[in-house]
Amino acid sequence: MLTQGSIVEAIPHAQLPLRYEALPSFEGQHAIALRRLIWLYFWLLIFEGALRKWIVPSLSTPLLVVRDPLVILIYLQALRCRRFPINGPMLGCFLLLVGFILLALVQITTGVGGGVLVAAYGLRTNFLHLPLIFVIPQVFSYADVLKLGKWILILAIPMTALMVLQFESSAGSWMNAATRSDVQQIEFAMGKVRPSGTFSFATGAAHFFVLATAFMVYALAQKRMIYPRWLVWSALLSVLIVQPVSGSRLLVLGCGLVVAGTIAFGMINLGRAQKILGVLVLIGLVFGALSFTGFFREASDVFMTRWNDASDAAGGVQQGIVWRFFGGFFEPFTLLPQAGLIGKGIGMGTNAASAMMTGALVFLLAEGEWARVVLEAGPLLGFSFLFYRVWVAGTVGVRAWSSAKQGKLLAWLLAWDACRSLVTEQISQPTNLGFMVFVGGLCLAALAEDRFSNRIASEPSSRHPVHNLGKGPDSRRRFRGSPLPVS
């Protein structure tokens, strides 16, 4: 029996009547809905902090996990339209989840940890959002990644303006409100508050602008302008202005890693080295021009004061920067005697556990991510979970490196933040967790650049190819093809 779906698959796409082009298949309809759910996840990631701080502060606590039911819905929809991958990384995640559930039961029955709610929140922190890394590339095409990049560059402009206003405002201003009425945003130097933008904390703004830097550099390095020129230039100004204003070493170092990745790309693709050099010179010139303005000099002075104070407090740059990063890998080994065989309780190292058990936001176990995981779950499962994250990061990094050697830039730029986050990110903070999985998924989706480049090369010239993304036949056929491999 012939159905619309069988006709669509049987007839070459270019010969389909218009009525079939306008009516996606049943599977395609679910895939489109799935893509919209992922977009909703992105928008909540950007604006959930604004909801918690300004719009509905009375619901700040439940909004902390507002993306949790959404990510479950994404998984159910992915299963429904056969976009939930069953591969090595996903099976590894499932086996670890089973192990952690069994460990949580042992801890609860032996009186270790904070009880059922704390253990459930710990399992949610470690595993609920992690599979999204592998679902996104099954749904997002390279065109979708560029669309999202355009929105990130658009958002970077008002986000910078908001952070400048927060920088200039007092700690008690409504613009610098925190997600709890009894706390304030952190002051970083000379009475200035570390601005958080629309996010609940400054780390969210840091992740956002590292992502914006990757898309901005990618756009500048292309032979053809993929975004409007005004947008790219405005994003460049925004990214540079926010560096000293942020007061965040994570933001500055993260953007620096993207620039380092750009330099490395030019070194392994000598044919594009001249273009890459031009991008770096342009960034340097704009930065130099900004340094002549009074506001930028003031913000830079405040940031350097914060940098020097933090370095001095930690024993110098070596202790404050280098050891803070690499020391986190050795800390869990020194804490093994405290962890014991089964750990101190899954979820005990999260902010939610400290709020439930003490009523305050304190580190009950450790501040570092590796130490938190090992102290919560003990050495066996703790190091297994950390090794899994390192393995996923290594897989993403190797594939991005292979893409870079073929002259494909975007996945390579995204990988620098994705891999760092997978290895070291403090995922007990929901915004950090959201950016870790989302950037990782975007990086894997960006590996499909070859197909997109071939399609653009075969189409008539356009000033901004991104304007037509998702409108051609490839965007409709995307959901009927095989999922992108991720392992």
Predicted regions and their residues:
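A membrane-periplasm/extracellular boundary helix in multi-pass inner-membrane enzymes
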Residues: L2-Q4, A161, F167-A171, I263-G315, ...
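Long extracytoplasmic/lumenal interhelical loops at the membrane interface
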Residues: I55, D301, N308-A377, V396-W401
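N-terminal hydrophobic segments of proteins, predominantly signal-anchor/transmembrane helices
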Residues: A33-W54, D68-F127
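Alpha-helical transmembrane segments of multi-pass inner-membrane proteins
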Residues: K150-S173, A177, E187-M190, G197-G247, ...
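Loop-to-helix entry and N-terminal half of a specific, functionally important transmembrane alpha helix
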Residues: R36-I46, G394-Q426
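Transmembrane alpha-helices of multi-pass inner-membrane enzymes
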Residues: I72-Y75, W412-S421, Q426-G470
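Interfacial loop-to-transmembrane-helix boundary motif in multi-pass membrane proteins
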Residues: L34-I38, F42-W43, P89-F100, V135-A171
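Membrane-interfacial entry segments at the cytosolic side of transmembrane helices
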Residues: D144-I152, I226-V232, I268-L282
